[in-house]
From Swiss-Prot:
Monomer. SUPFAM superfamilies: Peptidyl-tRNA hydrolase-like. One of its GO terms (molecular function) is peptidyl-tRNA hydrolase activity. This is Peptidyl-tRNA hydrolase. The keyword tRNA-binding applies. Gene3D superfamilies: Peptidyl-tRNA hydrolase (3.40.50.1470).
Length: 189
C-alpha cells in the first residue's frame, strides 16, 4: 500500500523548534524543502500542509499545529478529509530507544511510551500505521526523559540526527511506491 500522508511529529513554536522531540518535523521539513514545496497553515485542519510528488506518487506532508500529545486529532482530521487509511500513513518521530543517529522504519506496534504515537493510535483507532523512528538516544534514567526530549541536542548529536534524516529522506521514494519491505531493508540495515 502506497503512503499518501507523512506526518512529522513536533511541538509547535520557536521555543521547541530545535529540541530533540521535534526530530520528526525536521525530516518532514527537509523533505519538503528538497522538493521545493512550501507549507501553508490551515487553521481549520490545525496543521501546516504541503504536497510533494515523487515518481508520480503524490503525498501530503503534515506538521501538526497541536502539541505532541494531541497529534492524533490533527492526523485523524486530515486522514478522514482526504480518505487516507492508517496503512497509508507514515509517522516520523523521535525515538528514545534508538541511539543518536540511528533510524528505523517500522509497521504497526504500540506507542512505546511516546505520547504523540499514543494519541495517534487512540484517534485512528489502530496502531497499524508506519513509523520512521529517528534515534535521539536516552538520558539514562526515566526521570530525565521529559527534560531531555525538550532540550536541544549538542552539535555532535545534531549532526548525527541530520545524517539519519538524510538516510530517511533517501528511502521516501521507495516508501511512496508502497514497497515498505524494501525501504526497511535499506534503512534498517
Amino acid at each position: 500500500m502506497a503512503i499518501k500522508l507523512i506526518v512529522g511529529l513536533r511541538n509547535p513554536g520557536s521555543a521547541y523548534e530545535q529540541t530533540r522531540h521535534n526530530a520528526g518535523a525536521w525530516l518532514v521539513t527537509a523533505l519538503a524543502q528538497r522538493h521545493n514545496s512550501h507549507f501553508k497553515i490551515d487553521k481549520k485542519m490545525q496543521a501546516e500542509l504541503t504536497e510533494i510528488d515523487i515518481n508520480n506518487h503524490p503525498c501530503r506532508l503534515l506538521l501538526p499545529l497541536t502539541f505532541m500529545n494531541h497529534s492524533g486529532q490533527t492526523t485523524r482530521i486530515i486522514s478522514q478529509f482526504y480518505k487516507i487509511e492508517p496503512g497509508e500513513i507514515l509517522i516520523v518521530h523521535d525515538e528514545l530507544d534508538l541511539p543518536v543517529g540511528r533510524i528505523k522504519l517500522k509497521t504497526g506496534g504500540g506507542h512505546g511510551g511516546h505520547n504523540g504515537l499514543r494519541d495517534i493510535t487512540a484517534q485512528l483507532g489502530t496502531g497499524e500505521f508506519h513509523r520512521l523512528r529517528i534515534g535521539i538516544g536516552h538520558p539514562g534514567h526515566k526521570d530525565l526523559v521529559h527534560q531531555y526530549v525538550l532540550s536541544r541536542p549538542s552539535m555532535h548529536d545534531r549532526q548525527q540526527i541530520y545524517d539519519a534524516i538524510d538516510r530517511g529522506i533517501a528511502i521516501i521514494p521507495i516508501v511512496l511506491s508502497g514497497d515498505i519491505a524494501r525501504a526497511m531493508n535499506q534503512v534498517n540495515a
